[in-house]
Amino acid sequence: MMRNNPNDDRVVFFDVDDTLLDTSTFAETARKAAIELMVDNGLPLDKDEAYGVLKTIIRQKGSNYGKHFNILTEVVLGHEDPMLVALGMITYHNVKIALLRPFAETIDTLIYLKSQGYRLGVISNGITIKQWEKLVRLNVYSFFDEVITSEEVGAK
């Protein structure tokens, strides 16, 4: 089949994490801030020890697991402490939101590709709502014609 325009099929796909934005740095900073507040409010470990336990939990459960701080208090205290869990979760999310920024060249690159007639998409490993949250918070969601996550296709 002949194509009318060879440019009709020009597509560029991006990942979200560590491609459009630096998730590794903001996640580490947010986790350390959460641990600091949890320790300051009664988690009986020093900050480095507590962060080490949290990193072990994240390695075991995966970064998309939603109850890292619950498990942390269970491991350290022998039971879940809702106040400490809430402090950890709220601090993590507040710091994450404050630091969530696209890489410096992201917006210019997306604008350029769109201006050149490229269709843009996202293929990303993660929970669909979390990936969309990042795209919306970064205000880049409107650049993308398609967003596909591992959760949607049943992959891990």
Region locations from a protein language model:
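Short polybasic/polar patches that bind polyanions
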Residues: V39, E74-V75, K114, V136
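Hydrophobic alpha-helical core bundles mediating ligand binding, dimerization, or RNAP-core interactions
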Residues: A30-M38, L54, F69, T73, ...
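Conserved functional loop/turn residues at catalytic and ligand-binding sites
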Residues: D17-L20, G117, N139
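Active-site neighborhood of HAD-like aspartate-dependent phosphohydrolases
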Residues: M2-E49
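A metal-dependent, Asp-based hydrolase signature
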Residues: L45, T56-T91
